[in-house]
């Protein structure tokens, strides 16, 4: 059995080593033309596009998504759910429609997986934001409406226990349509609706077993986090109240689930209170903007960014000027899932090992129990940069990460820069990276590690003309 598993892994590695110098690639059943000047998506990344971990009801990411959706919709079932968007989007959807400048670093090939010049793997769920705003605008006659998007997103990144080229985001929004006050009525109906919505959320918060304690010094608004002119002071006050209580409801729900699990298992240091705090922030699509942090295991942890929707976002979605007001939020599901389920290595989220998957059940937040700890094997790759390309950016760190990831996949636990040296006489620059080869479910032999290391070194020389040391 061990031999068969090893042979399958080795075969897969050699297949992944080949780069995508082909005229077409197929992703989710659709063929796309490639471009030798632009295409940088790899076989290893394409293989992840159909995993959809956020849709698996007994996977930590799927469990968390489901808990949040159900809790938010337990108030008045306002949110339309969008969880099935495919990961390939256009540059228009991912960047242009959201106002990204042409020189924005997020567009760089060093950060983004391009299929060709016009298509890429989405880098955020906001690529579908305008479409969802348009859907709730066209489908709803109610004063209040909203949506939730969850999806896998893709970014070229470093390799360590908390970073992976694919992760999962959730974002959501709520809007209210402005209405005029009836004759003889003090406030318009939409203002009454927001007040009632706030009361409903507060009632749910009061029913939680461990009550949430909130520290909020963002009120009144600060000069560096001002309101937008299209909203009145009353609208900002009520809309921000509803936003903050809704986000607090999410935090209270998932952390109460965690605390209940800790009590059941008689865990040490089970919290007796749940403290959160609001801090001022900046985001391109909201103003004013905030972040919420939770006090957990002796430190403040950032959980979610949010704010009141900028008017230009609503206008791009087809709403008329001053027709609506609302709020939006965004959070990373993987990071919170790793925290709540006590998962030490992000690679585990992608494991197909039943020893991992059978530990989790729909609707429950339980602690991951490690089933093995195999030793790592360190290898250094040191090289001189080409003499005619002394700038380190000629070999972007994310390019090195992609070479390693595409060859070794999840058999690499981390890659770290351990030395950078410029020769005092020649001026040549040398880099040294330390690779920790460590499987999550079996021991790697020295022969396997050496083969992987040789492949990495050969590919690095071939692609970037470096000189190995």
Swiss-Prot record:
Q: Which residues cross the membrane?
A: none
Which EC number(s) does the record attach to this protein? Answer: 6.1.1.20
Catalytic activity, as annotated: tRNA(Phe) + L-phenylalanine + ATP = L-phenylalanyl-tRNA(Phe) + AMP + diphosphate + H(+)
- Give the transit peptide range: 1-17
Q: Name one GO cellular component term.
A: mitochondrion
Q: Which GO terms describe its biological process?
A: mitochondrial phenylalanyl-tRNA aminoacylation; phenylalanyl-tRNA aminoacylation
List localization entries: Mitochondrion matrix
Q: Which InterPro entries match?
A: aa-tRNA-synth_II (IPR006195), aa-tRNA-synth_II/BPL/LPL (IPR045864), Fdx_antiC-bd (IPR005121), Fdx_antiC-bd_sf (IPR036690), Phe-tRNA-synth_IIc_mito (IPR004530), Phenylalanyl-tRNA_Synthase (IPR002319)
The FDX-ACB domain, residue ranges: 372-469
Amino-acid positions noted as binding substrate in the UniProt annotation, renumbered to this chain: 126-129, 155, 162-164, 169-171, 302, 329
Main EC class of this protein?
ligase
UniProt keyword list: Aminoacyl-tRNA synthetase, ATP-binding, Ligase, Mitochondrion, Nucleotide-binding, Protein biosynthesis, Transit peptide
Q: Cite the SUPFAM superfamilies for this sequence.
A: Anticodon-binding domain of PheRS (SSF54991), Class II aaRS and biotin synthetases (SSF55681)
PROSITE patterns for this protein: AA_TRNA_LIGASE_II, FDX_ACB
Q: What are this entry's molecular-function GO terms?
A: ATP binding; phenylalanine-tRNA ligase activity; tRNA binding
> What Pfam families does this protein's entry cite?
FDX-ACB, tRNA-synt_2d
Fill in the subunit field for this protein: Monomer.
Protein family membership: Belongs to the class-II aminoacyl-tRNA synthetase family.
Extra facts: Present with 1800 molecules/cell in log phase SD medium.
Purpose: Is responsible for the charging of tRNA(Phe) with phenylalanine in mitochondrial translation.
In its UniProt entry, what is this protein called? Phenylalanine--tRNA ligase, mitochondrial
């Amino acid at each position: 059995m061990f031999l068969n598993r090893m042979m399958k892994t080795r075969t897969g590695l050699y297949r992944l080593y080949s780069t995508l110098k082909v005229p077409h690639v197929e992703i989710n059943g659709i063929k796309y033309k490639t471009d030798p000047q632009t295409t940088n998506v790899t076989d290893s990344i394409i293989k992840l596009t159909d995993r959809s971990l956020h849709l698996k009801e007994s996977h930590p990411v799927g469990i968390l998504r489901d808990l949040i959706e159900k809790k938010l919709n337990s108030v008045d079932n306002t949110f339309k759910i969008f969880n099935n968007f495919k990961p390939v989007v256009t540059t228009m959807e991912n960047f242009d429609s959201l106002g990204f400048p042409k020189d924005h670093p997020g567009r760089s090939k060093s950060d983004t997986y391009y299929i060709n010049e016009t298509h890429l793997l989405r880098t955020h769920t906001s690529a579908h934001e305008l479409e969802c705003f348009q859907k709730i605008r066209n489908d709803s006659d109610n004063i209040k409406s909203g949506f939730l998007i969850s999806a896998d997103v893709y970014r070229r990144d470093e390799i360590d226990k908390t970073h992976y080229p694919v992760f999962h985001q959730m974002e959501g929004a709520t809007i209210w349509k402005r209405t005029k006050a009836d004759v003889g009525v003090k406030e318009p109906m939409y203002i009454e609706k927001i007040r009632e919505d706030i009361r409903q959320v507060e009632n749910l918060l009061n029913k939680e077993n461990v009550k949430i304690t909130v520290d909020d010094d963002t009120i009144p608004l600060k000069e560096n986090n001002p309101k937008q002119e299209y909203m009145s002071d009353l609208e900002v006050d009520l809309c921000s109240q509803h936003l903050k209580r809704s986000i607090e409801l999410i935090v209270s729900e998932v952390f109460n689930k965690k605390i209940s699990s800790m009590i059941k298992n008689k865990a040490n240091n089970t919290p007796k209170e749940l403290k959160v705090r609001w801090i001022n922030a900046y985001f391109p699509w909201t103003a004013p903007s905030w972040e919420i942090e939770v006090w957990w295991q002796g430190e403040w942890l950032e959980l979610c960014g949010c704010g009141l929707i900028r008017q230009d976002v609503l206008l791009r979605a087809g709403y008329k000027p001053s027709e609506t007001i609302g709020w939006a939020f965004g959070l990373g599901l993987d990071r919170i899932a790793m925290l709540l389920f006590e998962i030490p290595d992000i690679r585990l989220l992608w494991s197909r090992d039943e020893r991992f998957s059978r530990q989790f059940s729909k609707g429950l937040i339980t602690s991951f129990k490690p089933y093995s700890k195999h030793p790592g094997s360190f290898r250094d790759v040191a090289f001189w940069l080409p003499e005619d390309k002394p700038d380190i950016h000629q070999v972007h760190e994310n390019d090195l990460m992609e070479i390693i990831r595409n060859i070794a996949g999840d058999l690499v636990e981390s890659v770290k820069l351990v030395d950078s040296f410029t020769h005092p006489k020649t001026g040549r620059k040398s880099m040294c990276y330390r690779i920790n080869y460590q499987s999550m479910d079996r021991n790697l032999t020295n022969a396997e590690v050496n083969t992987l290391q040789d492949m990495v070194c050969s590919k690095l020389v071939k692609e970037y003309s470096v000189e190995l040391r």
